[in-house]
Each structure stands twice: as structure tokens, then as C-alpha cells.
């Protein structure tokens, strides 16, 4: 008889600073209500994201019936990557009136290449269009 599959009891999506997960909110309460060992998750997450310090990394945590868990880390949000490439703190309050920065087509290609596994795109051209659209909606002009 094949081994039984674990029954999934919850899916938690969080965005946590890489290498800096701690039991304080928002991590503690989100995991606590599902009965997950918070310190175990924090140690595993920090070890997995140590190389990406400085970024906010989205994570998808699957919680099973026996309170064990698995997690998948995603690539940093496109908006954060665009802001870093443009060298600004935040996007424009009114993106279609006031532009806050400019990024080059090469920077867009670089971000699209990094984000490719998480994007709903079949090729790099489509991925670049998605990233350029995100940039436009933040008041960042794409040149080239």
C-alpha cells in the first residue's frame, strides 16, 4: 500500500524581510493560529534566504494536519526590484501625472529574467511587458 499523503490544513502567504524572520508580528500570529512551530520556521526561512538579505521575500507556507509544514520562497516583488533599480524610496502618488524616476530597457530585461519563474509569461518579451507595465503604474518611465 502506498504511503498516505499528508492532509493540508492551511496555506499561509507572507512577505518577510530576507534573513530576518522572527516570532514577532506578522510572522508569529499568522503561524501560531495554524499551530506551526514558529521558531523552527524562522530558523529554516532565515537559512534559506540568507543570501538575499535586503530584499523582501514572499513565502508560501503549506501547513499539514500533523502541524508540520513546507514552504516555498518566491522572487522579490517586481515593484521592489523596480524601485531599487531606479534608486528611489517609493513610487509616484499620481503615476500618470508625475514621474519619479527612469529605468532603462536593460534594467527591465534584468528584472524580467529574475522574475521569470513567478511570472505568468511564456517568454522574456512578455515578461518585460509585465515589468514595464508595473513600472508605469508606479510612475517610473522606461527608456529605450
From Swiss-Prot:
Query: Could you tell me one molecular function GO term of this UniProt entry?
Result: structural constituent of ribosome
GO CC annotations on file: cytosolic large ribosomal subunit
Q: Where are the transmembrane segments?
A: none
Annotated PANTHER family:
60S RIBOSOMAL PROTEIN L12, LARGE RIBOSOMAL SUBUNIT PROTEIN UL11M
Q: Which family does it belong to?
A: Belongs to the universal ribosomal protein uL11 family.
Q: How does it assemble?
A: Part of the ribosomal stalk of the 50S ribosomal subunit. Interacts with L10 and the large rRNA to form the base of the stalk. L10 forms an elongated spine to which L12 dimers bind in a sequential fashion forming a multimeric L10(L12)X complex.
The protein depicted here goes by the name Large ribosomal subunit protein uL11
Amino acid at each position: 500500500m502506498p504511503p498516505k499523503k499528508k492532509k493540508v490544513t492551511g496555506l499561509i502567504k507572507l512577505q518577510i524581510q530576507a534573513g530576518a524572520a522572527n516570532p514577532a508580528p506578522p510572522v508569529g500570529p499568522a503561524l501560531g493560529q495554524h499551530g506551526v512551530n514558529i521558531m523552527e520556521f524562522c530558523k529554516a526561512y532565515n537559512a534559506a534566504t540568507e543570501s538575499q538579505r535586503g530584499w523582501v521575500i514572499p513565502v508560501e507556507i503549506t501547513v499539514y494536519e500533523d502541524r508540520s509544514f513546507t514552504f516555498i520562497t518566491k522572487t522579490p516583488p517586481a515593484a521592489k526590484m523596480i524601485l531599487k533599480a531606479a534608486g528611489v524610496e517609493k513610487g509616484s502618488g499620481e503615476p500618470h501625472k508625475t514621474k519619479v524616476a527612469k529605468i532603462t530597457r536593460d534594467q527591465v530585461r534584468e528584472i524580467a529574467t529574475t522574475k521569470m519563474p513567478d511570472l505568468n509569461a511564456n517568454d522574456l518579451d512578455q515578461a518585460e511587458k509585465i515589468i514595464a507595465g508595473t513600472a508605469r503604474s508606479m510612475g517610473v518611465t522606461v527608456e529605450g
